Amino acid sequence: MQLSNLKTPCFILDSDKLVSNVLEFKRALNSRFSNHCIGYSIKTNSLPYMLHMLNELGCYAEVVSYTEYALALQVGFEKSHIVYNGPAKDKETFLDAIKNGAYVNIDTKREIEWLNNLNKQHSYKVGIRVNLNLGKISPEDAKEGESDSRFGFSFENGELEEAINKIQLCKNVKLGGLHLHRTSLTRSLNVYRNICKYAIRIINSLGLELDYIDVGGGYFGDKPNAPTYKEYVDTIYSSLLEEGIDVSKMKVIVEPGLSLIHISE
């Protein structure tokens, strides 16, 4: 194919570079965590050919709607290899994902009510989205005047604890994880250091016993003078370790999107 013959606008996918990026991120995670996964953010670029490649490379699919959930299944992702986030879930796919072992992070009060539709004879796990006020936990990395996120439950005003208590009333449902995604202005290492510390503060304050922490996305890619995948992972690892978390017993989920593909296109 001659590049000069292509009509614009168009995107060109460098498959080799995409593979290289994924493998580099996985090597970084392998160097620190025995249990981890990369949940690629489908909304970043949902080209089926590329999604199939990412599935073959062992990535999970991070989806935020029933249409993305359906697309992930269509291109071959197993249901247990899906991370289901966001307030746009529908009831049918929400319950289907939980029943089949997906990582489902609750974002809304209605989703908690939907848990009552699960078969009481089986046990299930869910996560919950924490509403991050980046202006408070990492002000140097936030936009001016930035406050609470639009998503999840606030720890400061008691919403998070109330939501967790309601989940725990469902005797066959266990809270398995926390989701703490917030894209920052700087995409710095400091953001992830502060997010991890904030997560541990919540865990200790509420006495939670979790299976995973999902630290979200918002990373730089292979860009000059920017943190590398390894530096991000090392920061997450050291921050959890410093706060007394046994990282051998907890899965770490990352949700890169643009950082994997922006120089593959």
List each model region and its residues:
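Residue-level detector of conserved catalytic or cofactor/ligand-binding positions
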Residues: 258-265
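Non-cysteine beta-strand/loop elements that form the S-adenosyl-L-methionine
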Residues: 64-67, 85-88, 125-141, 173-180, ...
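Glycine-rich beta-strand-to-loop/alpha-helix junction loops that act as flexible
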Residues: 182-183, 213-223, 256-258
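Flexible, glycine/proline-enriched loop segments at strand-loop-helix junctions
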Residues: 9, 99-105, 145-155, 184-190
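Short glycine/threonine-rich loop-to-helix capping motif typified by GTGT followed
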Residues: 186-194, 222-233, 264
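Metal-dependent enolase-superfamily TIM-barrel catalytic cores that perform enediolate-based chemistry
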Residues: 148-169, 191-199
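A charged N-terminal "starter" segment
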Residues: 1-118, 122-124, 161, 165-174, ...
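Alpha-helix-loop-beta-strand connector modules within alpha/beta enzyme cores
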Residues: 235-244
